[in-house]
Amino acid sequence: MKANDIKKGNVVEYNGGIYQIRDIERSSPQGRGGNVRFRFIMYSVPGGVKTDASFDADDNLPEVELLRRQSTFSYKDGEAFVFMDDEDFTPYTLDADVIGTDAGYITDGLTGIYVQVIDEQPVAVQLPQTVTLEVVETPPELKGGTATKRPKPAKLNTGMEIMVPEYITNGERVLVNTTTGEFAGRAD
């Protein structure tokens, strides 16, 4: 798979090891004919050793085939997250550092999660496109605020903060895009 096609969460082979991509920085230097470079922050699977590497857009990194198991978030065990396989009820435990910032989207009983498994070991989670979270704290709407589309900060039930439209109030359930971390609409 070419470096410019790789997304966060992909698992690739690099230097004889298997790594999961956690962060991507794209840079296009002006002086070198505009060759786009990608800097990947990746962690070894299993083990979680951090590696930082840069690639040209057309560099090839072989993608590793993983087993994806549809699961439901079950509970938190200390700092670890436990997911239950929807088919055979196998529990998959992932440490908080593997979950990373995605922890802000995970609520009790969240469904539609895929746990990525290599050699019977869970290595990552793939969240649904949107999740429903509750607004626990946001400033009140200003009078006449409907004429403008100013966003305001809102704290969600998972502790995460996002910007929401002015008409959203405390206690409302909102959809949040798990890729961008942005407000995606009201939940029913």
From Swiss-Prot:
| Gene Ontology cellular-component terms listed | cytoplasm
Gene Ontology biological process = peptide biosynthetic process
Q: Which Pfam families match?
A: EFP, EFP_N, Elong-fact-P_C
Q: Which SMART domains match?
A: EFP (SM01185), Elong-fact-P_C (SM00841)
What highest taxon heads this organism's lineage?
Bacteria
Entry-linked Gene3D superfamilies: 2.30.30.30, Nucleic acid-binding proteins (2.40.50.140)
InterPro entries annotated for this entry? Elong-fact-P_C (IPR015365), NA-bd_OB-fold (IPR012340), Rib_uL2_dom2 (IPR014722), Transl_elong_fac_P/YeiP (IPR020599), Transl_elong_KOW-like (IPR013185), Transl_elong_p-like_YeiP (IPR011897), Transl_elong_P/YeiP_cen (IPR001059), Transl_elong_P/YeiP_CS (IPR013852)
What GO molecular function terms would the record report? translation elongation factor activity
**UniProt family annotation:** Belongs to the elongation factor P family.
Q: Which PANTHER family match?
A: ELONGATION FACTOR P, TRANSLATION ELONGATION FACTOR KOW-LIKE DOMAIN-CONTAINING PROTEIN
Q: What is this protein called?
A: Elongation factor P-like protein
